[in-house]
């Protein structure tokens, strides 16, 4: 059996909500893939003045993405730096905390409960792209190739950069760790250089967590938000395969129009976007992945 279904699963699971400063719609669709391995989080006003959104694109199984979806916010809220409003450090530490939890006996037991197969060991991992809004400041932490794009002055302001093995800095680390990059893949296998999980790439006891073949340490980008900023678009890589960032934002803006933005209007914008991105068939390979997007409208 190949990676694709004979017909795509077009039904969507969409959640909407709002807080003091944001309205959001999060929508996911399995599409042509045999299984759904995306996960996501959305929590406006998780505490006063803080909202959190994130997408996690699983690979090698769904279990790590589901584990992170369940635990990320709880661990972030427990973090000492988070409580002190040191959000950049808190995000970095929470990414690493996910890996720490995964290797515990309790973590392994939970992974086995999520797994779709009966194999003894999980070789799964996931990307992580998390946006934290504190008052008028946006932080985006990224490990992997999911993305956040800010619609600023009706143009794209990119909040993350993909971590790919061919990137010179990433490739250098991989080679120092004793690995190699072939066809854009770590040791010929994984086409990401940073991810949560993927524990078999992180087992060299002589290396620190930031020196392994694959690392969970995110880049964090910070920007001050203003009246020129309209919404965030978070997505797993399946959302970004067929349209460039500017065209994605145009598609969303065409749905929003000049109307007052509501949860239902954002729901329509998110679901219409996934429908447009879904390929009519699998011959080209693009538009065939699981798709998850979160639209976060910034109230004025």
Curated annotation (Swiss-Prot):
Mn(2+) 1 binds at residues 57-58. Its main location: membrane. Enzyme with a broad specificity. Residues 23-298 form the PPM-type phosphatase domain. It catalyses: O-phospho-L-seryl-[protein] + H2O = L-seryl-[protein] + phosphate; O-phospho-L-threonyl-[protein] + H2O = L-threonyl-[protein] + phosphate. Transmembrane segments: none annotated. It is a peripheral membrane protein. GO terms for molecular function: metal ion binding; protein serine/threonine phosphatase activity. One of its GO terms (cellular component) is membrane. Gene3D superfamilies: PPM-type phosphatase domain. It holds the Pfam family PP2C. Its cofactor is Mg(2+); Mn(2+). This is Probable protein phosphatase 2C 2. Belongs to the PP2C family. Mn(2+) 2 binds at residues 57, 237, 289. It is an enzyme of class 3 (hydrolase). It comes from Paramecium tetraurelia. Keywords: Hydrolase, Magnesium, Manganese, Membrane, Metal-binding, Protein phosphatase. Its EC number is 3.1.3.16. It is found in: Membrane. Binds 2 magnesium or manganese ions per subunit.
């Amino acid at each position: 059996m190949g990676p694709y279904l004979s017909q795509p699963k077009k039904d969507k699971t969409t959640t909407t909500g709002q807080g003091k400063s944001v309205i959001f719609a999060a929508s996911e669709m399995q599409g042509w893939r045999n299984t759904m391995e995306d996960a996501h989080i959305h929590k406006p006003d998780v505490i006063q003045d803080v909202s959190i959104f994130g997408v996690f694109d699983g690979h090698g199984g769904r279990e790590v993405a589901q584990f992170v979806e369940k635990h990320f916010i709880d661990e972030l809220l427990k973090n000492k730096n988070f409580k002190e409003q040191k959000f950049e450090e808190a995000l970095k530490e929470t990414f690493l905390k996910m890996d720490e939890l995964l290797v515990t006996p309790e973590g392994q037991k939970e992974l086995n409960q999520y797994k779709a197969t009966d194999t003894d060991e999980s070789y799964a991992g996931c990307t992580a792209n998390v946006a934290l809004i504190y008052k008028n400041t946006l932080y985006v932490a990224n490990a992997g190739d999911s993305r956040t794009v800010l619609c600023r002055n009706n143009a794209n302001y990119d909040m993350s950069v993909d971590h790919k093995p061919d990137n010179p800095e990433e490739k250098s680390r991989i080679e120092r760790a004793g690995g190699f990059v072939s066809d854009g893949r770590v040791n010929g296998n994984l086409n990401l250089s940073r991810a949560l999980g993927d524990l078999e790439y992180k087992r060299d006891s002589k290396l620190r967590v930031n020196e392994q073949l694959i690392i969970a340490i995110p880049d964090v980008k910070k920007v001050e938000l203003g009246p020129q900023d309209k919404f965030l678009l978070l997505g797993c890589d399946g959302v970004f395969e067929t349209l460039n960032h500017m065209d994605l934002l145009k598609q969303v803006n065409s749905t929003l129009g000049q109307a007052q933005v509501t949860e239902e209007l954002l729901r329509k914008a998110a679901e219409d976007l996934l429908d447009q991105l879904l390929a009519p068939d699998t011959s080209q390979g693009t538009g065939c992945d699981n798709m998850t997007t979160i639209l976060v409208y910034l109230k004025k």
